[in-house]
Amino acid sequence: MEITEFASKSFAFRDVLHMLHLKTKSYPEHIALEELYKFQLKWLDSFLEAWQGFDGDIEFDIVHAEPKTNCIDCVMDYVGILMTAKGEMAEDMETYGWAVNEIESMMKQCFQTLYKLKNFVDNIGKKEDLPI
């Protein structure tokens, strides 16, 4: 996967994630998604700046993000994108080792979010379940 495609898909993921965050009726889901999209925005900015320092300017397109309704599927799709990019870069660790490490930090954040979504969202309930 070229860095241009990776950048475009990463921006699209953040847009979908932010939309899911705003649409959810579950407070724990709202918070978990907010943590991830804020982390991803800072992470992606830092990663792409470092890449441009390493390899020159990146020309990428802003792609239309396909809407999703399931936040777990959305995060898992992005983990797949991260794993593909990481796998290709890992073939030349001497050159891309720093990038592999950065991608792994984003994967870690995704896995933490998946843990929260799978274990806390359904257990805490939604607004209509509150005794108010």
Language-model features, listed with the residues they occupy:
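Acidic/histidine-rich alpha-helical segments that form the ligand environment
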Residues: 6, 62-117
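Helix-loop segments that flank and shape redox-cofactor active sites
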Residues: 12-35, 57, 90-97
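Acidic, low-complexity proline/glycine-rich segments
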Residues: 1-14
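Conserved alpha-helical segments that form or flank metal/cofactor-binding pockets of metalloenzymes
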Residues: 30-59
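Short acidic DE-rich linear segments
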Residues: 125-132
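Amphipathic alpha-helical coiled-coil segments
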Residues: 46-51, 112-121
